Amino acid sequence: MKKLFLILFSILTLGLFSGCGETKENTPAKKDEIQKVSIQIDGAAVPYYAPMYIAKEKGYFKEQGLDVDFYYAAAAEIVKNVATGNVQFGFPNADSVILAKSQGIPVKVVNTTYQHGLGALIFQKSSGITEPKDLKGKKIGVTSFGSPNYIQLQVMLEKAGMSIDDVKVEIIGTGAIVNALVSGQVDAIMFSMLRTIELKNQGVDVGEIRSDEFLPSYGNVLIVGDKFLNENKDVVSKFNTALNKGIQYIIDGNAKEAVEMSVEKYAPSFKGREEIVTTILDEVFIPYLWQSENTKKNGLGYSDAERWNNSIKVLKEYGVIEKEIDAKELIGNIK
């Protein structure tokens, strides 16, 4: 099972993808010169990437001498393009970066933007589920055996003294998994905690158990290639400064403005959903994803080596990676 899981996870996170353009030589910007850089972001343009958009629209990148272009792709493609220099920065999920580094792909995390993972067990309260031990004999939906959420489910069950054999796992596509919960096809799903608020907003009485309580992990992180970092530490530092300023602007009571701007200029498909997205920023991103005890002590985007190592050990234990790496090889706290 572990071997099959490794193959599936590798296909999902590090499949072969074509580059997004020819590799360009990266040269540091001269004083007062605007340097053009690009970042490839996980998935598609959504208002949850508001800090990036705020940093551009408010001129925070420009203040740092940067002109930033946004591109979007799957996590595996992002890691490869960053490593080869097709783009200077990437914003994939943390698990894909750990997998890439364990396979020798030369990338580093320079901003642990999401201080916690997004995974959660979501259930209808009528199911009788209140804690992990209540899952015995229940139907649990996951998107695939190769998904990070499947690992989260395994760890959650193990911590409760059970195994995957104690539940009935159903594989359901991303577009159908939430409806499967609402319709009663399954008793619970391992999915994104953002859906909890969306369901409550729709009048569905749901609860959640966040997977981070059992498996320390991270969501999206900022990465660069080793070569680019070695030659352009000042550029990386400037990008970090602008990104963190964008996050702080939203934290300081400007979530509504940030969402409205993001939807208008970058994510028009979210038109009409600004209110719920603002609620999600206020209730999940600001207090939980962007901030932690570590960021309070060390600043936004701080990378905790011990916590990263805990995530790496679990991925090794469950066969996601074959070679365990030290977090110090992966992270760099760039000020």
What do these predicted regions represent?
Residues I7-L16:
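Bacterial N-terminal signal peptides
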Residues L16-A29:
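Bacterial lipoprotein signal-peptidase II cleavage site
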